[in-house]
Regions:
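Structured non-transmembrane domains adjacent to transmembrane bundles in polytopic membrane proteins
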Residues: 46-163, 376-546, 552-567, 571
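Membrane-embedded transmembrane helical bundles of large multi-pass transporters/channels
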Residues: 1-38, 136-379, 495-750
């Protein structure tokens, strides 16, 4: 069945390539239509209090609260008044406020409220607060800055606020991607050139995966928009995680070209042997990413869908498109062949075995402390942490905060015209030590003033849709313990007057709700990913002990990785914390499967080996595909860490890079010892012989999936010439005539 399918694909290779080319071009045309969202609060579950509050305010009021502060130096009062009119006249400015809206500028300012004056003016300039449309861009922010600098007398301008932060995030995504993706491509070309026997092999692999990446990004148009984090790391992670699929195919293709003189037959055999291996590996990674969709915080669903979809597209591209390209480009591939660059890993294997026992003891000793420590890590939840301190918007924020102090503006919506409760709440809010101002209908027009007699602009801004709006300004940071404590205080004060009939919203309020949701999501994602991958491994190996060994090694590596921020006493992005659970688990299980397959295959093909020899040879055989794939993942994510301008994305890159390194160390040092202990235990239970259920089936069913390129195909020629291999006839499991396979000496039966 599988062979007939593979043969049909190769026979219709031109149609397959044409189909992938058409889909890639169509997807490329859609990429520009995919919107990118940098506001994390938009991904809160619809039922959270802050999300409900935002929706209620959008329905009840035409205007939002201010989301931009503009500080202009060098202008006088009249010039500030003219600039306020310029801002108000802009079509993208929904509302504006300046000193003249709070004090009477026709009389000397020195005779008026000095606290109010200090809020809007200092010795060098004036502050303006604007409300602009949510779909703002960096170009829009720069246009507002240009208007300010064009004002007569203006010498400098600083712009901050949530709108400026979001625009800066979107701008940094595009700039970072222009650096990160070419760097990742270069990493793949260099690493694959070392791991293959032709300079064209990395290009073919990149073409296949590149098509999958373009199709994945373009197909995001179905979702309408993706988060800035997904946009930043999705393509690089898809490239890095799915590269081992191409390595498996190239391994089997190199082997098949030695085995069969007919190029078409070689491609068919390579496809047939690779499909089960790649499908199993892709399934593990797919479910690892899909576990993110169980998060209540919808950015998890966003990332999970995009990454899981990318794995499916990479699987299809590697198993269908890449064999066709290998066959069609076989002649130029042969002309660009080169000698093997990678050294023998026998010394590496001996070194791993030398430290195996101490490594196992250390892994067991640190497992519990690492598990506990990872849950004690401090997290950042706000999107402002996604901006580098050197970014213009952060520099401007520091300038404005230094002049006028940190300030967060929240909105409280309460039932309309319940003046007794509203006045009582306003009094309680004004009494808070962090409050800088409270604006309500009562403070602006007077609660005794009939709505019909009040200023129309005051009424429309503060009363609408059955709600009265209270604007609370507080001298707090965006995301710290003081801010979160204030959220609880204000909610309690509102509940005292209105019960559940109020709505509170603001950036910090959203981050508070994100924190609550994230705490639940951590457990959900871990359990979902663990159960999904455990089930796939159980089906694959049909033996509970092998998945248990694999998952223990990988989970310990994850616990160690995620506990490091706690021991370093640094805070980290909780999104990176959640993503690494799925990414490291999915990627590292691939490596574990390669080692497990190699070990089980050796045990079946050479039962005369001593356990120590088997473990050493398994490490030697699995080193090339594991280290090649992990090197691509580590170097690509290291590039993200070094070149991304987003601190949160940098943290994610470092977490994945460090996690892949830790996983490699545990796989090569701890896992072989656990397999040996498992064999000894089973041997004693069965009277000194036998193997677990499923071990034989797995070992026989995975042909060359993780044995590495040095042991097969053209790379094996060097070993064969040196007398390190021999041809052996292996009878097929179904009893059909034997075929000749090249078996390196260390793997051949003695």
């Amino acid at each position: 069945m599988m062979e007939r399918f593979s043969r049909a694909v190769i026979r219709h290779r031109k149609a397959v390539v044409a189909l992938f080319a058409a889909l890639t071009l169509l997807s490329a045309a859609c990429i520009g239509q995919v919107k990118v969202n940098g506001d994390f609060s938009d991904y809160l579950p619809p039922s959270t209090p802050s999300t409900v509050a935002i929706n209620v305010m959008d329905d009840a009021f035409d205007s939002d609260v201010s989301n931009l502060r503009v500080y202009v130096q060098g202008i006088d009062l009249m010039q500030a008044k003219e600039l306020s009119q310029t801002f108000a006249a802009r079509s993208d400015v929904l509302a504006s406020e300046w000193l003249g809206d709070n004090l009477d500028t026709s009389i000397p300012l020195e005779t008026q409220n000095q606290d109010t004056l200090a809020k809007w003016r200092d010795a060098e300039g004036y502050l303006f607060q604007l409300t602009i449309s949510a779909s703002n861009t960096q170009e829009q922010i720069e246009s507002i800055r240009a208007d300010a600098l064009d004002a007569a007398g203006a010498t400098s301008c600083a712009v901050d606020g949530s709108a400026a932060l979001n625009a800066s995030i979107m701008d940094s995504v595009d700039k970072d991607m222009a650096i990160i993706m070419p760097l990742a491509v270069l990493v793949v070309l260099l690493v694959m050139a070392f791991a293959t026997t032709s300079f064209l092999h990395p290009v073919i692999a990149l073409a296949a995966i590149g098509a999958a990446i373009v199709m994945n990004i373009g197909s995001n148009i179905i979702q309408g928009e993706v988060s800035s984090v997904t946009q930043m790391v999705g393509a690089v992670l898809q490239l890095a995680v799915s590269m081992d699929y191409s390595i498996v195919l190239l391994t089997n293709y190199s082997h098949a070209t030695r085995e069969f003189t007919d190029p078409e037959e070689a491609c068919v055999r390579a496809m047939t042997r690779s499909l089960p291996v790649v499908a199993s590996s892709a399934a593990v990674t797919f479910f690892g990413f899909l576990s993110l969709t169980f998060m209540q915080f919808l950015i998890g669903r966003d990332m999970g869908i995009v990454l899981a979809k990318g794995i499916v597209l990479s699987f299809l591209s590697i198993t269908l498109l890449m064999p066709c390209l290998l066959h069609m480009l076989r002649r130029p591939t042969a002309k660009l062949e080169h000698r093997p660059f990678l050294p023998s890993f026998s010394k590496f294997a001996r070194a791993c075995r030398a430290v195996a026992v101490p490594a196992l003891v250390l892994a067991i000793a640190v497992a519990a402390p690492a598990f506990v420590a990872q849950d004690m890590t401090k997290f950042n939840y706000g999107s402002s942490k996604n901006i580098a301190e050197t970014a213009q918007v952060k520099v401007d924020q520091q300038t404005i905060d230094g002049r006028f102090g940190e300030e967060q503006t929240w909105v409280i919506m309460v039932p309309q015209e319940q003046w007794g409760h509203e006045n009582a709440l306003v009094s309680k809010l004004e009494a808070l030590p962090t409050t800088t101002s409270v604006t309500s209908y009562g403070t602006v027009a007077g609660s005794t003033t009939p709505l019909s007699l009040a200023n129309e602009s005051d009424v429309s801004a503060l009363i609408s849709g059955g709600y009265s709006r209270i604007v609370l300004a507080s001298a707090i940071g965006e995301e710290d313990d003081t801010a979160y404590d204030l959220v609880e205080q204000v909610r309690n004060l509102c509940a005292e007057e209105y019960g559940d009939s109020y709505h509170l919203l603001g950036d910090t309020v959203s981050y508070y709700d994100i924190r609550d949701v994230a705490t639940q999501d951590m457990v959900t994602v871990r359990v979902a990913s663990l159960l999904a991958i455990a089930l796939v491994l159980l089906i694959m190996f049909r033996s509970p002990s092998i998945p248990a060994i694999l998952l223990f090694c990988i989970e310990v590596s994850i616990w160690i990785n995620l506990s490091i921020p706690y021991f370093m006493d640094v805070s980290t992005s909780y999104i990176g914390f959640l993503v690494i659970d799925a990414v490291q688990l999915g990627a590292a299980v691939d490596y574990s499967i390669i080692f497990a397959h190699k070990y089980l295959r050796l045990r079946e093909s050479d039962p005369g080996q001593t356990p120590a020899e088997r473990a050493r040879d398994a490490i030697t055989g699995a080193a090339v595909p594991i280290l090649t794939s992990s090197a691509i993942l580590m170097l690509s994510t290291l590039g993200i860490y070094l070149f991304s301008s987003s601190p949160m994305v940098q943290e994610l890159g470092m977490l994945i890079c460090r996690g892949a390194l830790i996983a490699d160390l545990i796989i090569f040092t701890v896992m072989p010892t656990l397999f040996l202990l498992r064999d000894k235990l089973l041997g004693k239970m069965r009277g000194g012989g036998g193997r677990s259920d499923g071990a034989s089936r797995v070992a026989g069913g995975w042909h060359a999936g993780g044995s590495g390129l040095r042991q097969h195909g053209k790379l094996a020629g060097a070993s064969r010439a040196a007398g390190h291999g021999k041809l052996a006839k292996l009878s097929q499991r179904d009893g059909s005539p034997a075929k000749q396979h090249f078996i390196p000496k260390q793997f051949a039966q003695r």
